[in-house]
Curated annotation (Swiss-Prot):
GO terms for biological process: neuropeptide signaling pathway. It comes from Cryptocercus darwini. The lineage of its organism: Eukaryota, Metazoa, Ecdysozoa, Arthropoda, Hexapoda. Mediates visceral muscle contractile activity (myotropic activity). The modification Valine amide is found at V11. This is Periviscerokinin-3. Belongs to the periviscerokinin family.
Length: 11
């Protein structure tokens, strides 16, 4: 959940 570029879970 750092940028919106890569699909990262905000957990």
């Amino acid at each position: 959940g750092s940028s919106g570029l890569i699909a990262m879970p905000r957990v």
